[in-house]
């Protein structure tokens, strides 16, 4: 689903703005993101998450492009991970609490 949506909307718009890119390049990029590495997060492999030296705040979701399981696995792997509650955006009353958690996390992990 995310691959198809990106190929139909994001890819063509990006190629229009960037003449150095082609739809073939977009296809290869999206295939690597959404197909080849589909069992985990698309930006990094598990060993990178496991070795991540910086604090990470994981806010689980349950959508086709942000499935719950990889979020939880990321939080379990990252040595300095914090995890927000889930679901955090199903009602508008929960969003301020999630925002407060993000602000607290950022303040606590601000570089000196």
Label each region the model flagged.
Residues 46, 72:
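Active-site phosphate/pyrophosphate- and oxyanion-stabilizing loops and adjacent acidic/basic residues
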Residues 64-70:
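Conserved alpha/beta-hydrolase "acid-adjacent" motif
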Residues 49-53, 76-78:
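Short, conserved loop/helix-junction motifs that constitute active-site signature segments
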């Amino acid at each position: 689903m995310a691959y198809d949506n990106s190929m139909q909307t994001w890819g063509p718009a990006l190629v229009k703005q960037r003449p150095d890119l082609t739809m073939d390049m977009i296809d290869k990029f999206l295939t690597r993101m959404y197909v080849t590495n589909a069992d985990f997060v698309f930006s990094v492999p598990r060993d990178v998450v496991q070795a991540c030296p910086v604090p990470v705040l994981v806010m689980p979701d349950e959508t086709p492009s942000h499935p719950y399981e990889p979020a939880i696995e990321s939080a379990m792997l990252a040595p300095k991970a914090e995890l927000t509650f889930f679901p955090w955006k199903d009602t508008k009353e929960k969003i301020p609490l999630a925002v407060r958690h993000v602000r607290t996390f950022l303040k606590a992990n601000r570089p000196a």
